[in-house]
Amino acid sequence: QFTDVKCTVTKQCWPVCKKMFGRPNGKCMNGKCRCYS
């Protein structure tokens, strides 16, 4: 799942993915967080 959350490093996305989708799996791609379910 793509989000509109800006990021510079992957670890910034883990709490975002955890909060939005219930799992912390994800990474920073093209300056935005992308989450995996």
Curated annotation (Swiss-Prot):
GO terms for molecular function: ion channel inhibitor activity; potassium channel regulator activity; toxin activity. PROSITE patterns: SCORP_SHORT_TOXIN. The modification Pyrrolidone carboxylic acid is found at residue 1. Disulfide bonds join 7-28, 13-33, 17-35. Expressed by the venom gland. Its main location: secreted. Signal peptide: none annotated. Keywords: Disulfide bond, Ion channel impairing toxin, Potassium channel impairing toxin, Pyrrolidone carboxylic acid, Secreted, Toxin, Voltage-gated potassium channel impairing toxin. InterPro entries: Scorpion_toxin-like_sf, Scorpion_toxinS_K_inh. It is found in: Secreted. Coiled coil: none annotated. The record marks 27 as: Basic residue of the functional dyad. GO terms for cellular component: extracellular region. The record marks 36 as: Aromatic residue of the functional dyad. Inhibits voltage-gated potassium channel rKv1.1/KCNA1 (IC(50)=130-135 nM), rKv1.2/KCNA2 (IC(50)=3.1 nM), hKv1.3/KCNA3 (IC(50)=78 nM), and rKv1.6/KCNA6 (IC(50)=910 nM). Its activity (tested on Kv1.2) is not voltage-dependent. Belongs to the short scorpion toxin superfamily. Potassium channel inhibitor family. Alpha-KTx 01 subfamily. Negative results: does not inhibit Kv1.4/KCNA4, Kv1.5/KCNA5, Kv2.1/KCNB1, Kv3.1/KCNC1, Kv4.2/KCND2, Kv11.1/KCNH2, Nav1.1/SCN1A, Nav1.2/SCN2A, Nav1.4/SCN4A, Nav1.5/SCN5A, B.germanica Nav1, and Cav3.3/CACNA1I (when 1 uM is tested). Has the structural arrangement of an alpha-helix connected to antiparallel beta-sheets by disulfide bonds (CS-alpha/beta). This is Potassium channel toxin alpha-KTx 1.17.
